[in-house]
UniProtKB/Swiss-Prot annotation:
Disulfide bonds: none annotated. The keyword Nucleus does not apply. GO terms for molecular function: cobalt ion binding; phycoerythrobilin:ferredoxin oxidoreductase activity. It catalyses: (3Z)-phycoerythrobilin + oxidized 2[4Fe-4S]-[ferredoxin] = 15,16-dihydrobiliverdin + reduced 2[4Fe-4S]-[ferredoxin] + 2 H(+). It comes from Prochlorococcus marinus (strain MIT 9515). It is an enzyme of class 1 (oxidoreductase). This is Phycoerythrobilin:ferredoxin oxidoreductase. GO terms for biological process: phytochromobilin biosynthetic process. Keywords: Oxidoreductase. Pfam families: Fe_bilin_red.
Length: 258
């Protein structure tokens, strides 16, 4: 099944313009779509009480690039109560580049919005001053419109950069406007900057590459063990499917290989 033939490419899904932009930008760099195992590529389920059941659908989309991207994947969820776009680029460890992490989650009462160049090493060892300045400038511009959410714990914050966009919005029309305009604009800026940085970077030596491999594995292992989406996914799709999805697709260290 092609994602273009699903609800996730239609305006009824909140994040459709975002996923379209992701796929089109990756195509510009000649990334190839990666076939996701059928057990995880598309799934439908129901949730809620027997008297008030809702339908929910999930689509997992993937891509690779033979030189620059080990694995890029998007998890899309659509239901009356939950709407999710979770996206991660795992860059090749031959380049000293952070992850691109996107987590846009609409819950029954709130929107949780996370966008960042997520470091796999200490920030000072992965970001030069020019990139960091660009990122912080884009972040500040975004947060002129979007409120900054509560401070993250130290355990979690180590996996984010000073350029983190992190916001919590209530569900109302003004939030819809902010998502469709300011958030989309910032998302495009981050995506374009990230891909340009990734595809113009130079290869590292073997010593630094091993540090990057270790750093990527550290992040992926943390997310496998403590993914905050686990309770929501389990309630929508069941524990067995959720554990397999998290361990085999979303945060598998098997994708960290070059």
């Amino acid at each position: 099944m092609l994602i273009q033939n699903t609800i996730f490419y239609k305006k009824e899904w909140r994040w459709s313009n975002f996923i379209k932009l992701l796929i089109s930008q990756l195509a510009k760099y000649h990334c190839l779509e990666h076939e996701i195992p059928s057990a995880f590529s598309y799934k439908e389920s129901t949730y809620g009480s027997s008297k008030s059941q809702n339908n929910v659908s999930l689509f997992t989309w993937g891509a690779t690039h033979r030189e620059r991207i080990n694995f890029a994947r998007a998890v899309c969820i659509n239901s009356p109560s939950y709407s999710v776009l979770n996206f991660l680029i795992i860059p090749s460890t031959r380049f000293n580049i952070p992850f691109l992490g996107v987590d846009f989650v609409s819950l029954p009462k709130n929107h949780l919005l996370v966008l960042d160049f997520q470091p796999s090493l200490k920030v000072e060892n992965q970001f030069n001053s020019e990139l960091l300045d660009q990122l912080v400038k884009l972040k500040k511009s975004c947060h002129k419109s979007l409120p900054i959410a509560e401070k993250m714990s130290e355990e979690v914050s180590r996996f984010f950069s000073p350029g983190l966009i992190w916001s919590r919005l209530p569900k109302h029309k003004n939030s819809d406007y902010l998502i469709e305009n300011q958030l989309y604009h910032s998302f495009k800026e981050y995506l374009v900057l990230y891909l340009n940085t990734l595809f113009t970077s130079e290869e590292v030596d073997q010593g630094l590459q091993q540090e990057i491999i270790n750093g990527q594995n550290n992040y992926l292992n943390y997310r496998r063990n403590k993914d905050p989406a686990r309770p929501m996914l389990s309630s929508l799709f069941g524990k067995d499917f959720t554990e397999s999805l998290i361990n085999k697709v979303l945060f598998s260290t098997n994708k960290v290989y070059n």
